[in-house]
Regions:
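Terminal-region recognition feature
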Residues: 1-148
Length: 148
């Protein structure tokens, strides 16, 4: 399965034996809540990879965003991770990826990187009652994003 992330494990030969192992996580591409195609991934699969190691991690993000619910789950997983999490924006952390970026103990951006934050959006179909529900849902998502 193609994933929108990949891990780079530390090179044991080059590692200082007194320093803790550091893993690197690359978040690249669209963040998805459910797997609709082979190139999508669920937060559950992400969690399995996250907890398979320990120690500090560096998260490199280059993502246009994706599903805000999946991003919130990944944000929570990184916030609960027991080691230090350093986030580095490599290119772009847009939309839902900006939420994931806020989970870092430290967040670093180069002068040529971009973070794009916007109000949540959706497509809604239905009568006026359904439209009110959609507006309420968007307002709730906006508040949760602001809290990150």
């Amino acid at each position: 399965m193609k994933r929108f992330w990949r891990w780079s494990e530390p090179d044991c030969r080059a590692r200082d034996e007194t320093a803790p192992d550091a893993r690197t996580l690359y978040l690249e591409g669209v963040i998805a809540e459910d797997s609709w195609f082979e190139d999508d991934v669920t937060p559950a699969a992400f969690k399995a990879d996250l907890v398979s190691g320990s120690g500090p991690i560096t998260v490199w993000i280059n993502s246009p965003g994706g599903c805000c619910v999946a991003a919130a789950q990944i944000y929570n997983m990184l916030m609960e991770y027991p080691g230090d999490v350093t986030v580095k924006i490599d290119g772009i952390a847009a939309s839902a990826a900006s939420v994931v970026a806020m989970a870092g103990t430290r967040v670093l951006m180069s002068p040529v990187s971009t973070m794009m934050i916007h109000n949540p959006l959706t497509v809604a179909i239905g009568d006026s009652e359904e439209m009110r529900k959609a507006v309420q849902m968007l307002d709730e998502y906006k508040e949760s994003i602001i809290n990150a």
